[in-house]
Regions:
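Cyclophilin-like peptidyl-prolyl cis-trans isomerases
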Residues: 2-8, 16-195
Length: 195
């Protein structure tokens, strides 16, 4: 009788531990911190919704690729774009482009980060943009090209820095428009939580 009671108690304890562990272990969402010459901000990534995009972005982060790049395209009330050019407006060499993950349930709303690309839907490499307004017309369901832009995370702290960047004065430089007059430099991007 005592042995049956002990077995029942042990079984109940193990079941409780498994349920508690499952409930306490939500999907790991990495947090990445951007340090710029205008302040810092933190982005939470969505690897479940955009696994290829997040894996690609994290490879660039971990390799130090973004250090010394700039936000080269800034449009107030729309977005800030960076992650591919240096202060001389020269594009850095990138890895191969990735497949578009724009139909992942995430939308281009204020404070989200998405991959920049050319007119080819599967051309995203290192460049990204942060929406400073709700830009739902960039979602696959509403985009003029039927493809849209892949959101893969959101700013969870430091949005005031993003807004400050979005408010800088811009100019045309070479064949680029909307280039900040004073360079907005990404000093460092690092993983501060998750893998």
């Amino acid at each position: 009788m005592k042995n049956r009671f002990r077995l029942a108690l042990l079984g109940a304890t193990l079941t409780g531990l498994m349920v508690t562990t499952a409930m306490a272990a939500p999907a790991d969402k990495p947090h990445v911190q951007f340090e710029t010459n205008m302040g810092s901000f933190v982005v939470e990534l969505e690897p479940k919704a955009a696994p290829k995009t997040v894996a690609n972005f994290m490879q660039y982060v971990k390799s130090g690729f973004y250090q010394g790049t700039i936000f080269h395209r800034v449009i107030p009330g729309f977005m800030i774009q960076g992650g591919g050019m240096n202060e001389s407006m020269e594009e850095k060499d990138t890895k191969a482009p990735i497949a578009l993950e724009s139909r992942n349930g995430l939308t281009n709303k204020r404070a989200t980060i998405a991959m920049a690309r050319t007119s080819d839907p599967n051309s995203a490499t290192s460049q990204f943009f942060i929406n400073v307004a709700n830009n739902h017309f960039l979602d696959a369901a509403r985009a003029a090209d039927g493809q849209g832009y892949a959101v893969f995370g959101r700013v969870v702290s430091g949005m005031q820095t993003v807004d400050a960047i979005a408010a800088v004065r811009t100019q045309s430089k070479g064949w680029h428009d909307d280039v900040p007059v004073r360079s907005v430099i990404i000093k460092k991007v690092s993983v501060i939580k998750g893998k």
